[in-house]
Amino acid sequence: MTNIRKTHPLMKIVNNAFIDLPTPSNISSWWNFGSLLGICLILQILTGLFLAMHYTSDTTTAFSSVTHICRDVNYGWIIRYMHANGASMFFICLFMHVGRGLYYGSYTFLETWNMGVILLLMTMATAFMGYVLPWGQMSFWGATVITNLLSAIPYIGTNLVEWIWGGFSVDKATLTRFFAFHFILPFIIVALAMVHLLFLHETGSNNPTGIPSDTDKIPFHPYYTIKDILGAMLLILTLMLLVLFTPDLLGDPDNYTPANPLNTPPHIKPEWYFLFAYAILRSIPNKLGGVLALLLSILILALVPFLHTSKQRSMMFRPISQCMFWMLVADLLTLTWIGGQPVEHPYIIIGQLASIMYFLIILVLMPMASTIENNLLKW
């Protein structure tokens, strides 16, 4: 009798994706982040579901309902902090996953890569709307500032902002719709993640060398299931260390003050994972220019496959490109730091230089480095 795993219509899909999947034998721990992102997503949906059972999306009670979750609901505090810090872990894994793709040339799988860029944008949108829900000072002013950026769009901008707000300012209608979108988007992300996997399994995984590995494949289970479990345990350990010891380390103290439209916080800034994009936005002294730079800072990822000039796929054997990659990482860390600083000298000029460097490295220096390496190897 044939194994049910290979014949049952549903089990067959699971089998081909997670059990009998032919996988390169040499993929490193950088390939763990896909499964970690899946775990983060499931964790966020579960904790979010339990939070939604007690949360009220009304401006008068939203802040109190979050306080109520932390004080009165059984284990509400741990659910709330797992959800808040889970978002941080999600973005750490996302950045590592994208970085891995850039370093090892995984972006040459065009459909998989573009699907990933869409997933990144949707996750960012979800996280932004989730940050508004506790209705603290930073929630309110973050929502006001970021949605207001759309008013920079010529002709339709103002109408668009008022349409998103559901009124003439961020108010009850805004909070309610943000809650609705924040609830539905993760399920859309799950569906898109499945499409992402579908595209990946059409081509098979890349590997650190960037060389086709069809001659040396091993089954996903047990080799990579056990490896993913190790990664998952490290992820959960890190998350729980954050949650149980320093739950507010990555948050903003201003968000423990209820939203007040009459009092602007001295420094409006988003969560740490948006600071690099926020720094790029602020570095341009023109509203529309800033918004375009903000969009481009993420959408530039979709251009990367077309900027690949090297004859080799991976950066494993390309030292000049490696230098460029780590320069980009250092630049992003600089931008993240600048995004959290006030708009004053010398932070303004550092932010502007770091923003120029960001686009320069991706659009000019990396393709140039690849061409130089091709010539050095007489290719």
From Swiss-Prot:
Keyword Ubl conjugation in annotation: no
Keywords: Electron transport, Heme, Iron, Membrane, Metal-binding, Mitochondrion, Mitochondrion inner membrane, Respiratory chain, Transmembrane, Transmembrane helix, Transport, Ubiquinone
GO cellular component terms, A-Z: mitochondrial inner membrane; respiratory chain complex III
UniProt-listed Gene3D superfamilies: Cytochrome Bc1 Complex, Chain C
GO molecular function: metal ion binding; ubiquinol-cytochrome-c reductase activity
Sequence positions that bind heme b b566: H97, H196
Compartments where located: Mitochondrion inner membrane
Residues where a ubiquinone binds: H201
Signal peptide location: none
Positions of transmembrane segments: 33-53, 77-98, 113-133, 178-198, 226-246, 288-308, 320-340, 347-367
Binding site residues for heme b b562: H83, H182
Annotated cofactor note: Binds 2 heme b groups non-covalently.
Co-factor(s): heme b
GO-annotated biological processes: mitochondrial electron transport, ubiquinol to cytochrome c
A Pfam cross-reference name: Cytochrom_B_C
Quaternary structure and partners: The cytochrome bc1 complex contains 11 subunits: 3 respiratory subunits (MT-CYB, CYC1 and UQCRFS1), 2 core proteins (UQCRC1 and UQCRC2) and 6 low-molecular weight proteins (UQCRH/QCR6, UQCRB/QCR7, UQCRQ/QCR8, UQCR10/QCR9, UQCR11/QCR10 and a cleavage product of UQCRFS1). This cytochrome bc1 complex then forms a dimer.
PANTHER family per the UniProt record, alphabetical: CYTOCHROME B
Family (UniProt): Belongs to the cytochrome b family.
Record function comment: Component of the ubiquinol-cytochrome c reductase complex (complex III or cytochrome b-c1 complex) that is part of the mitochondrial respiratory chain. The b-c1 complex mediates electron transfer from ubiquinol to cytochrome c. Contributes to the generation of a proton gradient across the mitochondrial membrane that is then used for ATP synthesis.
Miscellaneous field: Heme 1 (or BL or b562) is low-potential and absorbs at about 562 nm, and heme 2 (or BH or b566) is high-potential and absorbs at about 566 nm.
Name of the protein: Cytochrome b
Organism: Ovibos moschatus (Muskox)
Phylogenetic classification of the source organism: Eukaryota, Metazoa, Chordata, Craniata, Vertebrata
Gene name tied to this protein: MT-CYB
